[in-house]
Amino acid sequence: MASAGDRRGGGGPPGSGDDSGGGWETVEKRVKKPAQQVGKGQWGQWNSPNAAPAPTAPWSGSGAFHHSGNTLVRHSDRRPARGTPRPPPQNRSTGAELQAPRGVVTAPLANGWQWGARSCPPGTESKEGGLPLSGCDPETDNAEGDDTSDDDNDDDMSDDLSDDYDSDASEKSFETRKNHKLFKGFFEVLDALSVEQLNEPTRQWHCPACKNGPGAIDWYKGLQPLMTHAKTKGSIKVKRHRELASLLEEELSRRGTSVVPSGEQFRKWKGLREGTDREIVWPPMVVVMNTVLEQDEDDKWKGMGNQELIDYFSEYAASKARHAYGPNGHRGMSVLIFDSSAVGYMEAERLHDHFVRQRTDRNTWNSAHKVTFLPGGKRQLYGFLATKDDMETFNRHCHGKSRLKYEMRSYNEMVVTQMKQMSEDNQQLNYLKNKMVKKEQHSKLVEDTLSVVTQKLRETMEENTIVRNKAKEKHLEYEKEMKYQEEFFHDQIEKIHKPTEEKEIKFEKLLQEERAKARQSDVDSGSTEDRRQRKEKIQNFIDCQVKDVEEFEAERDKLIKLHEEKKVKLKKEYLAKEFELEKELDTALTALMDKHKPDIFKSSTSPST
């Protein structure tokens, strides 16, 4: 079989006759074949519809390849697979007990797969984990085989690497790199799959970069674990794995997809169907059946009237009613027409639901067990939302203007959109109402505050008026008192000035009298010398008197001038003190006004929302 080397075994279970050696089948180095045959032999199983259960089919105890008494031993330096691990074998101990003991595996070929397995007694595997017991240590048993396997694989692929991996991979075309014999079959499988199939999380893959080496038999569920393995492989054949990761990423990018991160495609849910819209009769109508009453003399059927029908369903706010008539009169079919709005449709739907809950809906009317008459002879009315077929049936015998006009409209457009708009408008209305209420509350608060402030201001103004009047009265009293004091002191000063003036008059009179006495003493009696001496004495007396008078007047003027200067100085000091008093009064009044200044009313620009 051409692909036996890839699947590491024959086509049937051990002991079935296909495995004559009684152990693992030794794989020889196959001759290079055309790419088409390699792709079919190696990757044909991956893209088959039954590829999902591949981990359990070839490798578990129930598949085509069973473990015998010999234990499958891994290489000592091999890391755990980064893809999805193979499921644990089921009923391993049962398979081992039913199998005949196998002989020792023969030595592998020089260029084949180096399986360093050793024979172990049957049943030595652990029933719980499938691990070899003591005496079959995979670390010690396969130490030599691992080294040989790695060396042989590296030697076997040396010609491939020298041709395709020694130079810069970016210098080669994408197609050339993809058609490498290691990857060609893998990418042929990818090309045969659709994008949806590529992204299936249950599809399993082998790593082509691990071909003919450790990890070649590992399965990876989905491309993401395979990509992670190729990007993080770090022990052997690193360059080959990085090349695979680069090619796979480029291939998926060219096909308009990408490796979905692990977990994104698992646990998918199926939601509602995409199309939720439907066509409805517009304006909304409810068909009411069994509205016929009786036949008249002309064998014509009579039925319910328009207003009578509306009155029967007055709780549902129908705007109009119409009845279907034919050659035989009333056909027993009537229609309640509702407003052309979302509210009208909701009313019609509410009436329809009422009929459904009462089990007098369309299904009951169309059934063979419908009840048209109730005990007592009353007719049972049936109703349901109108459809296009109902309207065509209603208009069957109507022509021209007598036909009931209607149109088929989108439910989402006429009902859902309007209901959403109504909801938004209602929310906006509630918002505006709340805003208006808050504004009114704020206005009332401002009005109350303004009233209180105005009242306080009025009271303050009245108090200020009273204070000003009292201040004026006090000022008048002070002026009167000051005027009285001024008159009093003026009188006192006059009393001082008057005696002084009298003294001055007496003084001048005394001087004049003495001068007159001196002049009268000048007589012609006596000798000339005596007269001359008397005249000189009189003249000296007069001159001394004149001199004394001049000195008196000078000193008097000096005293008056000094007195006037003192008065001016005193007045200046008085005015300065009066100015200081006025200044102190102004400062005290300013402080008093600041102390009793009313609070400033601050109105917010807008109420809080």
From Swiss-Prot:
The keyword Cytoplasm applies. The gene is SGS3. Residues 49-58 have a biased composition (Low complexity). InterPro entries: SGS3, XS_domain, XS_domain_sf, Znf-XS_domain. Residues 138-168 have a biased composition (Acidic residues). Belongs to the SGS3 family. Residues 1-174 are annotated as: Disordered. Its main location: cytoplasm. GO terms for cellular component: cytoplasm. Residues 10-24 have a biased composition (Gly residues). This is Protein SUPPRESSOR OF GENE SILENCING 3 homolog. It is found in: Cytoplasm. GO terms for biological process: defense response to virus; regulatory ncRNA-mediated gene silencing. Required for post-transcriptional gene silencing and natural virus resistance. Residues 420-473, 545-584 form a coiled coil. Keywords: Coiled coil, Cytoplasm, RNA-mediated gene silencing. The keyword Thylakoid does not apply. It comes from the Eukaryota.
